[in-house]
């Protein structure tokens, strides 16, 4: 399930050529910088509501709203009819499709968001690919750097694959949904249509159309008289 077509509808991005020659989807992450060097043609066609910082190497499509306080450092390509909300921080090497949301106090770097991907509140998205109509609940963090030295590994069929990447956050397949305040640890791969429940710390691979639940034990007792 690690091939680009296993996770993503490549028709839902104008940048599908990023995946040409990729055996595994994560290989596209190391190609984003070079892709932007070749394809980025700076231009602003957006509406700005207030004061925002927009760097020189940025393209923003028609109908996109950039709210007050946003910082788009670039290089970055942002598609049509997106919302870049208050205090969003879009760093280096970012490609955002059409109809996407990068919300309040979100930080994004070295990332591709397919069309209609949504990260609306207090999210960190580093070195990741977010599929068509994928969604991050409020406070979701995608961790991209492990504490122990070495490349990030991915397990497949009981074997560990070396991704060759020191920084690698997550791959979210089309329609994947991550609950509020969950953490996706480095190298997480979430299949199409799968769900991670809120407050989970997830590591590893979740197949498509699955639900990962955090069954925390709770106890309810009678309140004693004061």
Annotate each predicted stretch with a short phrase:
Residues 15-18, 104, 110-116, 120-226:
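Glycine-rich hexapeptide-repeat left-handed beta-helix
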Residues 50, 62, 69, 86-87, ...:
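Fold-independent oxyanion-binding glycine-rich loops
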Residues 54-56, 74, 92, 168, ...:
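Short, conserved secondary-structure segments in the cores of folded domains
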Residues 59, 77, 95, 171, ...:
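ABC ATPase A-loop
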